[in-house]
Amino acid sequence: MLLLLLLLPPLLLLLLLLRPPLALLRQPQDASLSWLAGLQHRMARGALSWAAAWQQRRLEQSTLHAGQSQQQALTWCLREAQRPLGPLQGTTGRVYDVFGATDTSTFRNHLPLIKASQAQEEESGGQLLPPTSTQCYGEASLQATLLGLAALSKAFPEVLTPGGIACVTPTSPWPRALPWPWRILDKVVSTPGAKHPGALLLEALRSPGLRALEAGTATELLDVFSGLEANGEELAEAMAAGNPGSPLPSRAAELREALDLGPRGLALRLWPKLQVVVTLDAGGQTEAVAALEALWCHGLAFFSPAYAASGGVVGLNLWPEQAHGRYLLPPGAPFIELLPVKEGAQEEAASTVLLAEAQKGEEYELVLTNHAGLTRCRLGDVVQVVGAYNQCPVVRFVRRLGQALNVRGEDIQEDVFAEALGRAVGQWPGAKLLDHSCVESSILDSSQGSAPHYEVFVALRGLRNLSEENRDKLDHCLQEVSPHYKSLRFRGSVGPARVHLVGRGAFRELRAALAACPSSRFPPEMPRVLRHRHVAEGLQRRVLS
């Protein structure tokens, strides 16, 4: 620690001595800034640039020597796991001697692959991350936060001005709080808190000069805007009455006027200087991002600093200017392996490859090992390699294997179903898809003597009722994208998909119920296939047509 202090530049050392802390970075822009506060802000930006440059150099070195870096990451995971646990006991009860496996090849030969569901059930291994954790840990999470902030500042220089950012959810899109000695910069980054989303939204509404809007995930932000429309008058009355804070009757009038004009472009009407929306990418968020871009956040850029899974940060976003997420798989902890996925293959690949061995255009399932639960865990997240950064792959996330539909062996993958649903909604006049989830008919016992089928629950804007003709279009689109499904439908082995329109707030209630579950985890993935009857029945009770 003393060595680190000696290496810090004088600028950062002076910053640590300044009082008061940089809470002023998040004060409203109309607050009077003292000379000292202005100096603190400039120095905070300088310290952030230094820290990000330091992490960028580390990333360059690690990606130039990916094999060596992955070896070091594995050694760290083994050393950290050995401290509290001792020998690792697998799902079969067998004790695996992996702590002596100091090289990646020996480690992979000693420890078998297991699926995420098995990893969570291990008696001694525990879960990949504690379910109560609201932020990720490891070198990748720190890199994602520092490099993401630097990229955001470069692309949108005015975002990090005092009062320029507001987070409207209790969770943060930044994977990790800044550690000492950068803890004084925490107010640049939103950190999880106990505030209710309604209180956070009200705080943001009181600040018309916002430049960036933060939310834990896109689905959480979707719920925030849905709640804003439902409770807009209540929020306007609170602002006009000064509950909390000073009364802002003119701002309350602006809120009412903005809501009267409908959802499209609402964010820019409320915050005319808004430039970017920051959310954390995780499973099942693509649909929510598309809905936000088309409606409430129309005209705004979206940025995710990282892709997070249950084992931690697995991808870094170094390219905020790209509309669709491209993520670098870093060679540090957690230790990442890639399991080849072949389309139509009857048997799974027998062995994994390391990051430097990934081939462009190929698809792989992510396999993670971290110190919290020392398992070679198959996450089920499938990525496609689209490029390279030094010796490490740049990927896009394609689908989650655990979100496939399968009632007769047809195996409709998440991305295939999403394509079919998108085609169908495009044929429903005036409709915009907000959310969806599917249930296999056996879960709800809804076959009643007919062939097994899918129950599909959708939330829409612009369409209040679904005709039978529109409902049938989804089944036709499924047959277009999946020849196997078409064959089963022709033989009558699978019945037509049944589409149900649910009321406003149904998916918000679903996410709240999932978050309250003891096994919930961070980041909060959005399930597109529901496996539990009581969860599916919650949506079923909200069906409108």
What are these regions (language model features)?
Residues 70-121, 127-132, 139-143, 147-158, ...:
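Active-site diphosphate/adenylate-binding microenvironment
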